[in-house]
Amino acid sequence: MPHLHPHIDPEGLDEFSVVFTDRSLNHMSQRFGQVMRDLSATLREVYSAHQVAIVPGGGTYGMESVARQFGTGHALIVRNGWFSYRWSQIFDMGGFARETTVAMARPAGNEPQPAYAPPPIDEVVAKIHEARPDAVFAPHVETSAGLILPDDYIRALSDAAHQVGALMVLDCIASGAIWVDMAATGVDVLISVPQKGWSASPAAGLVMLSERGAERLAGTDSNSFALDLKKWRAIMAAYEDGGHAYHATMPTDALLGLRDAMEETSQMGFDAARDAQWRLGNAVRDMLAQRGVRSVAAPGFAAPGVVVSYTDDPDIRNGRKFAAEGIQIAAGVPLAVNEGEAFSTFRLGLFGLDKLKDVDGTLARLRTVVDKVIPA
């Protein structure tokens, strides 16, 4: 019998499973199987990954699944702000890491509103060689500070990690369309999400593995049931092989939307999306600099998808003045790198196909509001 709602699954079966109602795409359906295969193929292509796992929930779920799979020994964390502090929060709350070592971002100068830079790479490399961790965790883009790690910094981290037998784990949740090539940078585990760089609804953590990462996965066991990364990799493998499997319920409809958004990004061109992301981010940073607004990110480390700037105005910090003009921004948050109580910022997110396909229009809309909130 045909599906009661053909728009959900045009060639689907009449729904009498114990998992879904007629209003959701069934995880056993042919349509969802193709969605999973398409997701795997696109993610492997874009990130030069060897394997893919999808962990239901969101980016933090992906982070914790990776931590509970690979972080039970000695974890070294590059902390560039509040959302890489999240690695420490995961380890501290779970109590499963034998030891953690942290390398923190720091001010690049002594000004009252200093720009921040990641810890010097030579210092981090030396710390890796000294501590000999089992895994190194770093943020590609730090959402609280607007800091991005350049490819050569990531490559140096990976080289040092591999020299001591450690995995290199890179959080790309806030990377936007700045795709990281795992093969070129030596990254073993890369974490992304649907709702930022991929213009889809939040639903899962997307975990990509290099060959080395896949080998380590096969030889380790998670200490979580729901976040068992090896199990979620096996689920994806079942779909890749033309079948299906179940561990916990997948967000099927949201993953269908993610697949469609990936296809739209592919039609735009992954390189074109990346170039538009840089153009947009650089232009927004210039717009703010012309008004005397200071960036939290030091030159050379300024992310194009997240622009974080200083403000002394509490109604700019909390976003109220922007909301009054029709724009939703993100409030400033601490960095957790000993920045002091006076630290006060506001954050602009520049994610999504609608912005990247119309950089000029996006800049014009934002400029109209910035002119009112922060006059030149």
Which residues does each predicted region cover?
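Conserved N-terminal alpha-helix of the aminotransferase class I/II PLP-enzyme fold
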Residues: 17-62, 69, 80, 86, ...
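Internal helical hairpin/lid segments
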Residues: 74-77, 250-320
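Conserved active-site segment immediately N-terminal to the catalytic lysine
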Residues: 183-195
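Conserved C-terminal alpha-helix-loop-beta "cap" of PLP-dependent enzymes
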Residues: 289-350, 354-361
